[in-house]
Amino acid sequence: MKRKAFIQQSIVSTGGLFLLKDTFAQDKGKVFGHNNITYRLDEKWGQLDTNIHPVNDCHEMVQDSRGRIVLLTNETKNNILIYSKSGRLLSYWGTEYPGAHGLTIQKNGHEDFLFITDTQLHQVYKTTNKGK
């Protein structure tokens, strides 16, 4: 009889641990994608003061050879925003691309070059990732 009571008590105690696991679990963010390709949204990544660094429309993002994320926006206060992988703003530049829409990156030698397509000005610009 003691054995039966021990087993019942063990089951009840262990079941409680599984319930507590979900109670104290932290939300890891929304998951997007399908099949075996999924992405988790990090809502704290890259949060900036929109009065200082506004983003009108994010038309393109690329990763440079140093692992930094380059974001292109048609906001002429800062057409290019460069982030670390962790979401910290490293630099920003560009005020002359009102129709910034396409962004491609190409490594030439030891340097990355950005190709920015501006659909409003009907131009394609080649720059360094410092805007020169």
Locations of regions flagged by a protein language model:
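N-terminal secretory signal peptides and thylakoid transit peptides that target proteins
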Residues: 1-14
